[in-house]
Amino acid sequence: MNKFIKKINFIKNFSSCENWEEKYLYIIELGNKLSPFPEKFRKNSNLIPGCQNDSWIYLIYENTKKIKFYGDSNSLIVKGLIAIIFILHEDLKLSEILTFDVKPYFNKLSLTNYLTPSRVQGLSSISKFIKKSARCLLIKEKIL
């Protein structure tokens, strides 16, 4: 998924799903659209702590001042949840990521109502990992 769908389109599409099964399939579909995860990023430093499944995230701050998101998981649903979180963070500046809260979006979509407690914890871990990565990129940019 080189270019994510916009937040508004995601919310519209997700909300138009008639039942949880359709939403679940849509989440998996989003995960399948993620850009391939480069093997060189598949290391322990990019492994998301607190996820039951092996899941990786890597952020690149490009010369265009855009953030390139990479994510992968050995769970289809977690991979889709990573894609959703990337969609919600799309077009944010590094500094905005530090204060961005995904919870209102999850509440609006009732997403956490349909997930197991461990998946909800995984969402929190993914969000924290993205904030940590953004903070590291900000520090690196200020030093360079």
Swiss-Prot record:
Quaternary structure, from the entry: Homodimer. Interacts with SufS.
Top-level taxon of the source organism: Bacteria
Where are the catalytic residues? 51
Q: Gene for this protein?
A: sufE
Q: What does this protein do?
A: Participates in cysteine desulfuration mediated by SufS. Cysteine desulfuration mobilizes sulfur from L-cysteine to yield L-alanine and constitutes an essential step in sulfur metabolism for biosynthesis of a variety of sulfur-containing biomolecules. Functions as a sulfur acceptor for SufS, by mediating the direct transfer of the sulfur atom from the S-sulfanylcysteine of SufS, an intermediate product of cysteine desulfuration process.
Annotated keywords: Cytoplasm
Q: Which GO terms describe its biological process?
A: iron-sulfur cluster assembly; sulfur compound metabolic process
Family that this chain belongs to:
Belongs to the SufE family.
* Alphabetized InterPro entries for the sequence: Cysteine_desulfuration_SufE (IPR023939), Fe-S_metab-assoc_dom (IPR003808)
Q: One Gene Ontology cellular component annotation?
A: cytoplasm
| Localization in the cell | Cytoplasm
**This protein is called what?**
Cysteine desulfuration protein SufE
What pathway is this protein said to act in by its record?
Answer: Cofactor biosynthesis; iron-sulfur cluster biosynthesis
Q: Which organism is it from?
A: Wigglesworthia glossinidia brevipalpis
